[in-house]
C-alpha cells in the first residue's frame, strides 16, 4: 500500500491528541509529523523531536520558498508544517499523521488529494 497523509481535526478539547497517541502506540506504519515553530523550546522539548525550532528568518524563508505545507502566525510566533516532513515520512513507507485545525486540513487536502481526513466530534460541545 502506498503511504498517504492522515489528517486529524476536531474542536479544541475533543480528544484528538489522545486518540492519535493511542494509534501511534499500536501501529508502526504511521508517524506524527514534526511541525515547525519560532517559539522557544519549553523545558524538556527537543529540536527535531517535539518541534523543529526555527528562527523567524528561517521560517519566513521557508514560506517564501513554498516549503511550508500550511502555516499560521499566532501572536508573535509562527507555527506550521514543512512539506519535507510529510514527504520524508512517505518516502520511508510511513503514513504521516497531521493533527491540525479544519482550515489547515483543507489546505493539506488540496495539496494531497489522496489524504484521509478524520474529524473527531465530541459527545457534547458544552
Where are these regions (language model features)?
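The feature captures the helix immediately C-terminal to the Walker
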Residues: 20-21
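Walker A/P-loop
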Residues: 17
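Conserved phosphate-donor/acceptor-positioning beta-strand/loop module used by diverse small-molecule
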Residues: 96-101, 111-126
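ATP-dependent small-molecule kinase phosphotransfer cores
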Residues: 37-98, 102-106
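Pre-Walker A (Motif I) flank of P-loop NTPase domains
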Residues: 1-6
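Post-Walker A helix-loop "phosphate-sensing" segment adjacent to the P-loop in P-loop NTPases
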Residues: 24-34
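ATP-binding Walker
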Residues: 14
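P-loop (Walker A) phosphate-binding loop of NTP-binding proteins
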Residues: 9-11
Amino acid at each position: 500500500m502506498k503511504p498517504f497523509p492522515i489528517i486529524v481535526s476536531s474542536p479544541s478539547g475533543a480528544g484528538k491528541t489522545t486518540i492519535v497517541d493511542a494509534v501511534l502506540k499500536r501501529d508502526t506504519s504511521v508517524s506524527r509529523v514534526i511541525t515547525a515553530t519560532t517559539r522557544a523550546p519549553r523545558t524538556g522539548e527537543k529540536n527535531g523531536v517535539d518541534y523543529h525550532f526555527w528562527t523567524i528568518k528561517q521560517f519566513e524563508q521557508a514560506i517564501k520558498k513554498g516549503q511550508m505545507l500550511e502555516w499560521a502566525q499566532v501572536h508573535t510566533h509562527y507555527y506550521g508544517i514543512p512539506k519535507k516532513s510529510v514527504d520524508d515520512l512517505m518516502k520511508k513507507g510511513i503514513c504521516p499523521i497531521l493533527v491540525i485545525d479544519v482550515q489547515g486540513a483543507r489546505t493539506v487536502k488540496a495539496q494531497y488529494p489522496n489524504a484521509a481526513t478524520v474529524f473527531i466530534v465530541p459527545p457534547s460541545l458544552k
